[in-house]
């Protein structure tokens, strides 16, 4: 799977990157919400791990932006904020799952696998659409004629 990690805490971001790469995933990591949201709307990902507390825009706003651009993209909130209100806000913003820190690595990997299975079972919207001599690449957000 191609996974986008959005986590401002450097040691956790690097640890998650190493863990997921060792498990065979391709990982792109960002520490700030705005560049991560831009990346997640421009590029194709199979899953997003998203922290709630980020230095520029919060994870709720990143989640909303990603959800608008990619309705079927699995998003797992991974955050220290574990109140009922925080969990409900994350899920209402479009997160598919919510895991509080600290977490067990096995549980995180199981949740990633579960979201991946669910996404694989759901037919995706076409990434490339062709009509009347025009080609729209929704994954790259480009259009060309001919």
Q: Where does each model-flagged region fall?
A:
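N-terminal/domain-start alpha-helical segments
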Residues: 1-120
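Short, Lys/Arg-enriched segments at the junction into DNA-binding effector domains
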Residues: 2, 114-146
